[in-house]
């Protein structure tokens, strides 16, 4: 008579999941409960930090964006050409923010409702990168418009027409689409068997993610350099106005503009630091992963996989 082997997860209350059934026969595991806790934490992080919390935040942000469109679009039609030149960039940024929200909704849909394959992942990355790059472009356009309006007011009034602003926005969007498509195709190179590239996970994951970090860091750097240049230029202009004894309302307005730009620069720089740092941690975690492990090897590597998921969570919440 065969004696059934004891359940190694029986002494792990609160951590047991139905997914543990394939791991009961593993012989290379010494402490099942520790690994069960890691797998349970991974499941909870995926459920709450990548699905429920981002979706709740996105619903709130989506309502705010709908309100912005509801208020901005009718008023934009009533504005004169000078005001439209400023708010057309704000409208572009609102579109980018809405795309970012939709990208957050797409992530759990891809994870839970579809099979991972090259075209699905590439489409998601393209959409996400397009929202990010178009947002960066909107920030750059708004900052440059403020710079021209303050430093070169005559050119802003006479030469910088609404048509030129629209053409600039179209140029930024076309550039964002081009870069996003390139990033989407490259970053999804090792996903699925139907990928047009013969590149396996172990060889491609690290270089592809490094390529993504370079693209993101370059976009952040361009925007931050332009913001810093405008802040320094306005600061010098303010010093010159003070030396001339100019204490008019225009000078006070310049001080307010500088404060807003500096606050935006600080927030954007903080976001860039955390985004790039989290991406670097993600690359280090990916370098330790492999898709060729069997179920028991995957369970034994649960700690490193938990760190990998935490990196993904940080990136998701930051975005």
Curated annotation (Swiss-Prot):
Residues spanning the membrane: 49-69, 107-127, 131-151, 166-186, 206-226, 261-281
Keywords from the named record: Cell membrane, G-protein coupled receptor, Glycoprotein, Membrane, Receptor, Transducer, Transmembrane, Transmembrane helix
GO-annotated cellular components: plasma membrane
Domain of life assignment: Eukaryota
Family: Belongs to the G-protein coupled receptor 1 family. B0244 subfamily.
Localization per Swiss-Prot or TrEMBL: Cell membrane
UniProt-listed Gene3D superfamilies: Rhodopsin 7-helix transmembrane proteins (1.20.1070.10)
InterPro entries with a match to the protein in the record: GPCR_Rhodpsn_7TM (IPR017452), Put_GPCR_Chromadorea (IPR040435)
Example GO molecular function: G protein-coupled receptor activity
Organism: Caenorhabditis elegans
Subcellular location, principal: membrane
Glycosylation site residues: 28
Membrane topology: Multi-pass membrane protein
Taxonomic placement: Eukaryota, Metazoa, Ecdysozoa, Nematoda, Chromadorea
Protein name: Putative G-protein coupled receptor B0244.7
